[in-house]
Amino acid sequence: MNVLLVSTSDIEGGAARATYRLLQGLRQNQVQTQMLVQKKCSGDTAVVGVRATSGMHQASVGLRLTLDQLPLKRYPQREPGSFSPQWLPDRTIAQIKQLNPDVVNLHWVNNGYLQIESLAALAKPIVWTLHDMWAFTGGCHYSQECDRYTHSCGTCPQLASSRQADLSQRIWQRKRKAWQKLNLTIVTPSQWLADCARKSSLFKDCRIKCIPNGIDTSVYRPIDRHVARDILKLPQDKYLLLSGSLGGIMDKRKGFHFLQPALQEISQSEWGDQLELVVFGQSQPSHPPNLGLKTHYLGSLGDDYSLALLYSAVDIFVAPSVQDNLPNTVMESIACGTPCIAFHIGGFPDMIEHQHNGYLAQAFNIKDLIDGIIWILSDQERYQKLAEHARAKAVKEYALSILASHYHQVFTQVLNG
């Protein structure tokens, strides 16, 4: 069996990293696998694509994204967030034909990489792993409160459009026309995304299977907290909360508008002197937001070992997103034995078992988010149990060998008709 994974990048971004882990898992399970990308950031010979160090190619990739976004110029009042028309012709199908795989496993193929119409020219069995909602919407990657993807989109709230025949409906129509005869098998990492796909007008008749992303649990593992903090120069005498980049302040989906007031309120409580915040994914901004707590900005951590060290150094990972699939950050955290707190939405309930290995706050309830943080920290014996359960779940459900086995079964079924 010869498998080809197709992704915009190999290790740049959460979806790319999840795909690259699948590549590693399949190859470790002796499945002949390559990964075709628009932007190659690793030195892995199993990844086919031009290295990101090529200045001319970098410029070409940037130009494709800029051109892909041109139709959005007609919607100057649109909300911040990703929206992908995917209208540019591409050479991807020719590259796939040259590699001649038995089965093609699409992943995140946006940023102008793969044209919607190109899929119709793929004369290969296609398994499409969804990392967000884009494949079955009119262009948005997360629909927020909108359910127009269950019909034909149009009057798109993210475009601030009042017209039914807007860009979102045209993109939806392009997908329906191009994909209606394709024999697609859909894989989603979370049950929530599987349910959304089943409700969608585009994928309601497809085979849909849920397979969680995987993680190398020999790399993401608990490391002595004292040692981890010493290496990262973090305080030994404080409880540390971890959050991802605050660069999504303008993107309401990231939930900063819930995190900020929660931390500010905690800072005014008896816990205020005991807690500090750690932020990774960005350096300290010139005008940092007022979060109430002393904040350590660690910048981007580019390798798995540094990330494992970070998760092991903190007490809780806080994920305040209002809509999300199966974020790598939560999986990485629990693999390191660090409990997580998130709202009871999206794919979080797949990973976080309430008061067993973490805490699921009532959706968008700031008080419950605060209560959850305090509940996790206030009993050391209970905390130890949460940490043990978190690690056990990651090993049992998310190890790369398990991921590869599930995908191998799907590929075999697809090839056997």
Predicted regions and their residues:
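Conserved acidic donor-binding segment of nucleotide-sugar-dependent glycosyltransferases
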Residues: 354-355, 359-366, 375-380
